[in-house]
Amino acid sequence: MPMFIVNTNVPRSSVPEGLLSELTQQLAQATGKPAQYIAVHVVPDQLMTFSGSSDPCALCSLHSIGKIGGAQNRTYSKLLCGLLADRLRISPDRIYINYYDMNAANVGWNGSTFA
């Protein structure tokens, strides 16, 4: 159930077609989880600053049941910062990603939970 959320001040008009699909496929490969369970939410046009500057930036979160930890998170950071830099022109040093290892009982889906 990985869920990747990107809040950014990049305008909607600068979000390329296919970005959400690309993030879905890349996260499926990186996490080893089926693409059918991956959710991606990009929220453009946000009023944001990073280091006191309104240059392009992003505040992100990746939630997953398992597959979250030190070495894995470094791999995800490299992948996701690279994609956001390439596709949205956000410098990797202007991106924060918070990682959340979710308890399966606390994640609802399809009328139940993953527990």
Curated annotation (Swiss-Prot):
Q: What are the UniProt keywords, alphabetically? A: Acetylation, Cytokine, Cytoplasm, Immunity, Inflammatory response, Innate immunity, Isomerase, Secreted
EC number of the protein: 5.3.2.1, 5.3.3.12
* Active site per UniProt: 2 (proton acceptor)
UniProt-listed InterPro entries = Macrophage_inhib_fac, Macrophage_inhib_fac_CS, Tautomerase/MIF_sf
Which residues does this entry mark as bearing N6-succinyllysine?
A: 78
* Class of the enzyme per the UniProt entry, highest EC level: isomerase
Record: residues binding substrate: 33, 65, 98
Q: Which residues carry this modification: N6-acetyllysine?
A: 78
Indicate the principal place this protein occupies in or around the cell: secreted
What GO molecular-function term can you cite, just one? Answer: dopachrome isomerase activity
Q: Does the keyword Secreted apply?
A: yes
Keyword Cytoplasm part of the UniProt annotation:
yes
Location relative to the cell: Secreted; Cytoplasm
What function does this protein fulfil?
Pro-inflammatory cytokine involved in the innate immune response to bacterial pathogens. The expression of MIF at sites of inflammation suggests a role as mediator in regulating the function of macrophages in host defense. Counteracts the anti-inflammatory activity of glucocorticoids. Has phenylpyruvate tautomerase and dopachrome tautomerase activity (in vitro), but the physiological substrate is not known. It is not clear whether the tautomerase activity has any physiological relevance, and whether it is important for cytokine activity.
Q: How does it assemble?
A: Homotrimer. Interacts with CXCR2 extracellular domain. Interacts with the CD74 extracellular domain, USO1, COPS5 and BNIPL.
Report the sequence similarity comment from the record.
Belongs to the MIF family.
The protein in question is named Macrophage migration inhibitory factor
Classification of source organism: Eukaryota, Metazoa, Chordata, Craniata, Vertebrata
